[in-house]
């Protein structure tokens, strides 16, 4: 899917069926979304989009008439969904998921990630935001960002920057947090 994004504030992904989300910012004015879906019931997956409050909402569901398996092998009939997103620079990224891990690279106007099991990897990250994980580790490579980090049971390795143009709050219950600041 390719859409013009000049009027979008950003994207909001809410799904417990997506396994991995890759987001990279670009200098283009186009939003590009592609998916990889594997599993025995892949054809029943629906990726739904809707525009609300200038955000493109992305959710997942099953097609009408889909019935979940109720047999001894049901636990082995898993679905793997991976999203690849190219987002124009300086847009917002919001993700709520109990399963997904997120890898984001580039410049964002705001980032809000709330993940239960997934990890977060921010590469060459510029922007402000909040990252919360329950079990997943948080790794950030940034510059000129004030970092507030806390983990109840994980380790903290946080580099500070003498210049703070942005603020990023990182919290995890069981995950470790690592931040490097490049010059």
Segments from the language model and where they lie:
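Intrinsically disordered, low-complexity terminal regions
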Residues: 1-183
